[in-house]
UniProtKB/Swiss-Prot annotation:
Belongs to the ThiI family. Catalyzes the ATP-dependent transfer of a sulfur to tRNA to produce 4-thiouridine in position 8 of tRNAs, which functions as a near-UV photosensor. Also catalyzes the transfer of sulfur to the sulfur carrier protein ThiS, forming ThiS-thiocarboxylate. This is a step in the synthesis of thiazole, in the thiamine biosynthesis pathway. The sulfur is donated as persulfide by IscS. This is tRNA sulfurtransferase. One of its GO terms (cellular component) is cytosol. Residues 404-482 form the Rhodanese domain. ATP binds at residues 183-184, 265, 287, 296. It is an enzyme of class 2 (transferase). The keyword Transferase applies. It comes from Citrobacter koseri (strain ATCC BAA-895 / CDC 4225-83 / SGSC4696). One of its GO terms (molecular function) is ATP binding.
Amino acid sequence: MKFIIKLFPEITIKSQSVRLRFIKILTGNIRNVLKHYDETLAVVRHWDNIEVRARDENQRLAIRDALTRIPGIHHILEVEDVPFTDMHDIFEKALVQYRDRLEGKTFCVRVKRRGKHEFSSIEVERYVGGGLNQHIESARVKLTNPDVTVHLEVEDDRLLLIKGRYEGIGGFPIGTQEDVLSLISGGFDSGVSSYMLMRRGCRVHYCFFNLGGAAHEIGVRQVAHYLWNRFGSSHRVRFVAINFEPVVGEILEKVDDGQMGVVLKRMMVRAASKVAERYGVQALVTGEALGQVSSQTLTNLRLIDNVSDTLILRPLISYDKEHIINLARQIGTEDFARTMPEYCGVISKSPTVKAIKAKIEAEEEHFDFSILDKVVEEASNVDIREIAQQTGQDVVEVETVSGFGPNDVILDIRSVDEQDDKPLKIEGVDVVSLPFYKLSTKFGDLDQSKTWLLWCERGVMSRLQALYLREQGFQNVKVYRP
């Protein structure tokens, strides 16, 4: 099988040296992602496209899906690459490929040609279109808005029969821009802002301020791992977790009620800036939108920025909540965000929307900054690929099994789309489907006399969810890894 990767248009208008660098980086990213599906595949870069050739037909859908999620790709063409002799040969091959698809439909033919030939692209379109119209009685030519467009590409002595076109996410290849650190909370905003910077070519690391215990961190790990696995798995990234409960306690004790929100954000920026400096990261990323909450007025944002020299990027600054939720739905983080436990350790009764710098600084004079230094120093830092192993260490009390007993039921916790694409069927045991994002609200409705064996393809989500359910008091859960 063969795929032709078309570049994001902004890449094609770069200077020659920059364009070549972007294409080289994108080629490497494609190799890094696809090697998990087929180690024998070939990725070949050209000036205006990249070819992907693979042998394992069983991985066709998986490879195609992975390509649509790699930043820097505008669209993917799935093609059949065959030799040809003349225009009539092109027509005959197109007839075999498209006959069934054109029955009872309107169609047109569109040809792109590269190389030296005795015919033009328009001549091929007319010849092939006329031939198809004559040989398929129920088909009819329609040049504007046809039911089917027959796409052909002629390159030297090769004919590319385009079997399908699939849109990519666009943007720049990850690694063409410098690293950033996303302040991720697991909600709608931070997930979308992280995705937007990945799509713009940045390697996105994650920094999480834990205000609500292990359950909150588990949920945020899921979001970060999902974003990385789906859009950024070509690169290694860090997941940094900072226990911010001591900082919140100090704020509650020492800071005036109305100033708490701004002071908390300033503390987070200070801590994140220290982490960014430690790892050589150039900017912070937040999901703040202008006017969304009291701390996100222009005055307050300016005061928050003042505590650090590190650049703070806010890709959602002009977005409304509905737009953000729609984007979260498109990238697949909506369900995470809707079920994410909400923790707010600092809730002001009357938060200021126009903080005064002198007053904020006066309140911060009461704060013991050694507490902030301590939590940053003790922050955990893991390679996001090791989240499964890290979770395995955390879930020491959750048993992992490879078989099942008479009272066991396997619980498939994959998303609905994954379940539909690859239904789980195992002889000798009942299989129940319940997506991971419904476990927190629906698991209690299941038969609690049964032992539930949580299963997902890679085992990451099942371990995370097993720990979460154990913390909620459910002892009848195990992790199933055949």
